[in-house]
């Protein structure tokens, strides 16, 4: 489940520290409102979505069935289950975004509960763990990695095309009820949510008992 984080609580396929630092600095200097989306905001979203889309595919490429089904402990997800979760969750997140963009723009009367940098940090920080809910914990929806990855990549293609072409004023529309952010930030959070699970896949692969083949 995606959580909105405060500070308290690239066009590339490699997650390098300088990439995150550069993107964070750029986001901090971005505008609060844009009508429609600025090219700077568009590029930041595009870079992050392309990065995480490629990284998911890279992390699972060439893994054996034993590796895909390996669990660090019985109560933790396997790599196949992580990808299945993304394939189940992202369609809901995408629909939520489209719904939030329909009402009259309202961010001039509201204040975001998080900065862009907070949302970027959410993708990196694996110290704070959140419990998945809303049906997104149904990680056995896709028993086959290829099917789950195909669903994930197909929707990612749709979202990336939207980022490239939309004229929606995403900064002007709020998202959420209790902890409000703007719709541009929610779109970014869809990608940083995937980034968290990429980190999770890496943790599984780095476990001492992870199958060698």
Regions found by a protein language model. Give the residues of each.
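Short, contiguous alpha-helical
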Residues: 69-119, 161, 165-213
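Charged, amphipathic alpha-helical oligomerization/scaffolding segments
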Residues: 48-51, 55, 92, 151-154, ...
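N-terminal targeting signals for Sec/Tat export/insertion, comprising classic cleavable signal peptides
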Residues: 42-70, 195
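Second-shell loop/turn segments in exported
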Residues: 39-46, 67-73, 78-84, 138-149, ...
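A charged, solvent-exposed segment within the mature domains of Sec-exported extracytoplasmic proteins
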Residues: 126, 130-190
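Bacterial N-terminal signal peptides
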Residues: 18-31
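Short, helix-capping/interhelical loops that line the mouth of catalytic, cofactor-
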Residues: 30-44, 95-152, 207-213
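Bacterial N-terminal signal peptides that target proteins for export
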Residues: 5-21
């Amino acid at each position: 489940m995606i959580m909105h984080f405060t500070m308290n609580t690239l066009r590339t396929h490699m997650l390098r520290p300088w990439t995150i630092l550069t993107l964070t600095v750029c986001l901090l200097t971005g505008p609060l409102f844009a009508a429609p989306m600025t090219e700077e905001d568009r590029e930041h979203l595009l870079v992050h979505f392309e990065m995480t889309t490629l990284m998911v595919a890279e992390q699972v490429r060439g893994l054996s069935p034993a590796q895909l089904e390996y669990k660090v402990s019985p109560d933790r997800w396997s790599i196949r289950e992580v990808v299945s979760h993304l394939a189940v969750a992202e369609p809901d997140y995408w629909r939520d975004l489209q719904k939030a963009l329909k009402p009259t723009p309202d961010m001039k009367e509201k204040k975001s509960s998080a900065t862009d940098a907070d949302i970027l940090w959410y993708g990196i920080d694996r110290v704070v763990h959140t419990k998945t809910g809303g049906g997104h914990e149904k990680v056995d929806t896709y028993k086959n990695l290829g099917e789950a990855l195909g669903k994930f990549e197909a929707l990612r293609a749709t979202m990336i095309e939207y980022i490239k072409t939309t004229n929606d004023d995403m900064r002007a529309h709020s998202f959420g009820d209790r902890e409000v952010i703007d719709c541009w930030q929610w779109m970014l959070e869809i990608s940083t949510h995937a980034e968290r699970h990429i980190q999770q896949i890496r943790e599984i692969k780095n476990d001492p008992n992870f199958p060698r083949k």
